[in-house]
Amino acid sequence: MLERQRPLTPPIAETSSYPVQIPEAQRSLFRQVLALFEQKKVSYAVAGALALQEHTGIHRDTKDLDAFLTPENAALALRYLRQEGFDCEVCDPVWLYKAHRGVFYVDLITGMSNAVIVVEDSWISRAQPAVVHGTPTRVLAAEELLVSKLFVTRHERFDGADIAHMVYAVGNRLDWPRVFELVGEHWELLLWALIFFRYVYPGETHCVPTEVWQSLIVRFQDVIGRADPHTRFRGSLIDDKMFAVDVKDWGKENLLLEYRLRRLKTIPDVR
């Protein structure tokens, strides 16, 4: 009997410092969307692969344009895109709306899927000028882009390499107090990401200021020294599928559900 072969997973594109060839139809669509947002005065910032490229020089093939907006501005953007004939959908009201034509699409992102991190006006006001596909626009500041990737830790997608590349490229110029402000009580994820960076780039430890390392390590030693066995389980905030057994079978708390329900109560209606 022939052994059944497992289906092949789609190949993952390699990162490169050389520009990727983008179909003109895709460029045109992205330019149209950015021009529409400018015309309608929708406050946004480009994120994703295009923002990563701006901060690190790394090019990656992508069929989508990621735009970060506050929930209120995402609702406006979706309305304007519908008026322009885009097919629009609310994928997840907590964080993601999509507008597409053919195989190319725009992601309107208002936060992280676990609802821990939410895009606020300050994210947009701190965005920096850039030119994307020949169009003057703004990309997320490095601090916000880095923090937006901290919770992308799922089994099927991990943004640790992006974070490591960002720290390598701009770590010495980062506004670290702003990073600490954004991560708040989830600072241990930042420590985890920086230890990952240190493993990848052991000779570039200086990209993270000594006082940042010391601050995080002292805080970590403090919480380890007074560990509370009643501290709530946070695995579902990382990956609800991989930690489903903890919640469903072992009776651990479902913080993901709590965060998302709390967030849903504050989201504007999008029609």
Over which residues does each language-model region extend?
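Compositionally biased terminal segments of proteins
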Residues: 1-271
